[in-house]
Amino acid sequence: ELVALTAYNRMLHEQFPELKQHRVSLHSLFLGNPGTGKTTVCKIFGALLHEAGALSKGHVVICDRGTFIGTLWGDEERAMKQVVEMAQGGVLMIDEAYLLNGKNENDPGKIIVQLLMNLLADESQRDIAVVLCGYKEPMNELLETNPGLLSRFPNRFEFADFSVDELLEITSRRIEEYSYRFTVKAWQKYTDMIALAFSARDTETWGNARFIANQLERIYIQHATRCVKQPPKNHNDLLLITPEDIVPIEMPRRKNRIGFGV
């Protein structure tokens, strides 16, 4: 809808250049756990806004709190200026933006937030879209602590965790990319393992596609180790993942609540 409205405004301006344009804010919030595709969608977002005529380039510059913090007075302002110049014509994505929520008055995060507010209020900075990314609840705390930010980011997108079926689909695509394949028993063992991990996940920190990537990396290493120790008789089996290659997941321990059970 945001892209459509932007494209419509462009068409309207081309046909009736004398009309005053309604400015559409491109600044957005991407909220969700790691591995839910926020960075990927941000790149698509930039490309679509470029195609719609809202951004002159559509590229994405990714940064975080550490990008802006220095050791000398004024480092934050210099870093912000440099990053904004790099992102001109595209999208400035600030990952884990909730870390800008300073816990005390001297926290440099407060300076960065104020510099960001100044950027958003600058009418000359129209050829840039700022996207703040992070976990939902910490991001809400950032917005509550800095109410001026909320009005500057009218576009809110929430990224839900992938389902078990979606995680298995991600797995299939990743292994096909490298020509690996599972035996029937190995796939069953893997799917049971992912389903169990999903049911026991911490919904606030679950890694989603990143979790799958990490598990596959462990499987690849185990598979390679096995093949070196016992080379397959058939060269086609060099890419065949067996049950022995499926490395068990260390299940996270659930936090015990303080108090007495009834």
Description of each model-found segment:
Residues G207-K229:
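C-terminal helical "lid" of AAA+/P-loop NTPase domains
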Residues E1-L26:
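Pre-Walker A (pre-P-loop) alpha-helix and adjacent loop at the N terminus of AAA/AAA+ ATPase modules
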Residues R65-D75, L99-K110, R156-E158:
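Flexible beta-alpha connector loops of hexameric P-loop NTPases
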Residues Q222-V262:
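C-terminal engagement/docking regions of AAA+ P-loop ATPases
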Residues L19-G58, E85, F153:
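Walker A/P-loop
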Residues Y98-V131, E137, E144-L150:
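Conserved catalytic/switch belt of AAA+ P-loop NTPases
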Residues G58-A87:
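Short glycine-rich substrate-engagement loop in P-loop NTPases that contacts/grips substrate
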Residues A52-K57, E141-T145, L150, F159-T205, ...:
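Conserved C-terminal "switch" segment of AAA+ ATPases
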